[in-house]
């Protein structure tokens, strides 16, 4: 099977964007240089785990050789067992040596076909060079990655798509959908067929119940898609012509259906009220930015950042460039929020708009008027609106120093002329 052809197109596209648009190769290269100064993880494995050679574990060696032959892999693979009671596995590559690590619990409780699925999945990350992008994770956990917000959004979206690609490689290794299902059920839920009668439509109902919850937005930062999504994606692939010639789905149909499935995991408002809050912030933010007759980049960046932080993976799609359409959206969302929103919804909407107004280092009379008009339109009294504005100012201050910007601009202009000489 051509592993390059079965890779999920969404994974390929997002990887390309991360490198071409966000230039992540510089961060990856820097991280690789830092890691060279530390003891390698392989050295730790040699000290803390057992390497399963053909003599020590002929069973595992046979599985590895079978999968290598099926995939046409020529690189050497070494296999480690790490003593741990949970089911887990990972792989990494140093030069031309691939190291695969399974926990002892997984090896003891998974049959050969299930191990093939997990092995194929982990090798998929190596084959598709995913592990380089994983160097973008920030190990100190203060932030998810080393990336700015929009790049991080793209990275987290890509991460889930990468898992879809590798699940396909896992299926290619174990050959049957049932084996892939059994493996993922054990890893995720700790359940076997003894206690679980697998029924994908029933599991998808669980996802349907969760889909309308705002908790789904929190799950958007997780590295893996929810299990029902993964199982459905594998089922789609197993019925495609990419997996078998007799498959019902063409490559294009598979891609479209997988895209639709993955959209369930995106970061986007799950309730109508929150969606209207987002649309009001998008349209109201632009209206306020334009009110001073001066389009300030700091205010625009603040608007986009708030949309990305609070509401959506794709903030640009919420910006309306047609003035009449933006005004109509503003009126519609204001009316909806007044009728259906809570005081908390109205408070935070005005809070976000206030943050945008402060982001250029000024708070003008015109901006205040726009905020007060918006407050009235969504059902906040003038007193409550001023309370929101004042508390936002107290909590966040004015982060842009106008005088500092003037100095920086003077220096920039001076040295621009100097460099021309």
Features from the language model and the residues they span:
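Acidic/histidine metal-binding catalytic segments
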Residues: 78, 132-137, 176-186, 319, ...
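Short helix/loop segments within enzyme catalytic domains
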Residues: 48, 55-59, 67, 71-73, ...
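Small-residue-enriched hydrophobic alpha-helices in membranes
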Residues: 151, 155, 185-220, 233-421
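Short, conserved phosphate-binding/catalytic loop or strand-edge motifs used
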Residues: 97-98, 140-149
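Short pre-active-site segment immediately N-terminal to the catalytic Zn-binding motif
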Residues: 52-55, 101-117, 157-160, 340-341, ...
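A metal-dependent hydrolase signature that marks the N-terminal structural subdomain at the beginning
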Residues: 1-74
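Active-site scaffold of zinc-dependent metalloenzymes
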Residues: 68-76, 85-112, 129
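Catalytic Zn2+-binding segment of zinc metalloproteases
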Residues: 108, 113, 122-139
């Amino acid at each position: 099977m051509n592993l390059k052809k079965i890779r999920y197109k969404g994974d390929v596209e997002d990887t390309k964007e991360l490198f071409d648009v966000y230039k992540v190769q510089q961060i990856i290269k820097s991280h690789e240089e830092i890691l060279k100064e530390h003891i390698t993880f392989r050295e730790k494995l040699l000290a803390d785990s057992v390497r399963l050679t053909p003599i020590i574990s002929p069973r595992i060696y046979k599985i590895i050789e079978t999968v290598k032959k099926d995939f046409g892999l020529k690189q050497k693979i070494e296999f480690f067992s790490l003593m741990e009671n949970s089911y887990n596995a990972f792989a990494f590559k140093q030069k031309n040596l691939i190291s695969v690590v399974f926990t002892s619990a997984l090896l003891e409780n998974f049959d050969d076909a299930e191990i093939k699925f997990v092995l194929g999945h982990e090798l998929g990350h190596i084959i598709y060079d995913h592990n380089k992008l994983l160097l973008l994770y920030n190990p100190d956990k203060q932030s998810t990655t080393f990336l700015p917000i929009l790049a991080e959004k793209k990275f987290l979206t890509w991460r889930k798509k990468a898992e879809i690609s590798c699940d396909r490689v896992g299926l290619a290794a174990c050959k049957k959908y049932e084996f892939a299902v059994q493996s993922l059920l054990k890893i995720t839920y700790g359940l076997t067929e003894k206690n679980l009668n697998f029924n994908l439509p029933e599991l998808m109902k669980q996802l349907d119940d969760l889909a309308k919850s705002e908790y789904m937005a929190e799950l958007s930062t997780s590295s893996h898609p929810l299990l029902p999504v993964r199982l459905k994606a594998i089922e789609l692939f197993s019925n495609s012509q990419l997996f078998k010639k007799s498959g019902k789905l063409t490559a294009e149909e598979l891609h479209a259906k997988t895209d639709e499935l993955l959209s369930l995991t995106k970061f986007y408002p799950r309730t109508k009220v929150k969606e209207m809050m987002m649309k009001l912030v998008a349209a109201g933010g632009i209206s306020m930015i334009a009110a001073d007759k001066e389009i300030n980049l700091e205010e625009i960046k603040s608007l986009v950042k708030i949309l990305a932080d609070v509401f959506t993976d794709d903030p640009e799609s919420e910006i309306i460039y047609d003035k009449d359409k933006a005004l109509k959206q503003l009126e519609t969302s204001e009316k909806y929020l007044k009728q259906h929103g809570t005081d908390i919804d109205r408070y935070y909407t005005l809070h976000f708009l206030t943050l945008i107004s402060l982001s250029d280092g000024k708070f003008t009379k015109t901006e205040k008027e726009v905020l007060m008009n918006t407050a009235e339109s969504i059902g906040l009294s003038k007193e409550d609106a001023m309370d929101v504005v004042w508390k936002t100012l107290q909590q966040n201050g004015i982060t842009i120093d106008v005088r500092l910007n003037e100095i920086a601009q003077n220096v920039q202009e001076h040295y621009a002329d100097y460099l021309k000489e």
